[in-house]
A protein has these predicted regions:
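Conserved short alpha-helical segments that host acidic/polar catalytic motifs at enzyme active sites
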Residues: 1-172
């Protein structure tokens, strides 16, 4: 089962997210990642393997710093464990983490591909990120509400929008 952590506050977001993900390690996972608002944009760091692997990767490539972000530990359901399939996933203006299964992700992916949207991972999560971005109209709540109506399955999402740098959105649907 995946683990999701979100943070908005005055402390170093990366530290808070990593600490939160560390508390979820007992659940088991194959990859980990975080997305942090840094210098006016969303910075994503993710890695196959343990949380320690993510921390070592950030030490080599740069550790994001900010005050708002989301984090994730993944237990693969779609796509093999890899850096590419690790969460968070971005659709451009929208970055998400996800727990659960989107049962109709293939149909949604085909719809988006028909509109010229491209994909880099094998995950249902990237499909949701791209669908949110495709539908984004400047209103996160309206976009999320319209998008989740089309998602079939049981899931929870942590979402950040590039133009709303002080907010983390979450939704949950279990059928």
């Amino acid at each position: 089962m995946c683990g999701i952590v979100g943070y908005v506050g005055k402390r170093d977001c990366t530290e808070v997210l990593l600490n939160g993900l560390g508390k979820l390690e007992y659940r088991g996972y194959d990859s980990a990642g975080i997305a942090v608002f840094q210098d006016g944009k969303i910075t994503v760091a993710k890695s196959k393997g343990r949380l320690k692997d993510l921390e070592e990767k950030m030490e080599r490539e740069g550790r994001p710093f900010g005050h708002v972000g989301i984090g994730h530990t993944r237990w693969a359901t779609h796509g093999e464990p890899s850096d590419v399939n690790a969460h968070p996933h971005s659709g451009g203006r929208v970055t998400i983490v996800h727990n659960g299964i989107i049962e109709n992700y293939k149909e949604l992916k085909d719809f988006l591909a028909g509109k010229g949207v491209t994909f880099t991972s094998d995950t249902d999560t990237e499909v949701v990120a791209k669908l949110l971005d495709y539908r984004y109209n400047g209103s996160p709540i309206q976009t999320i509400s319209e998008t989740v109506r089309d998602l079939e399955g049981s899931y929870s999402l942590g979402i950040i929008f590039a133009d709303h740098p002080e907010q983390v959105y979450a939704c949950l649907l279990y059928t």
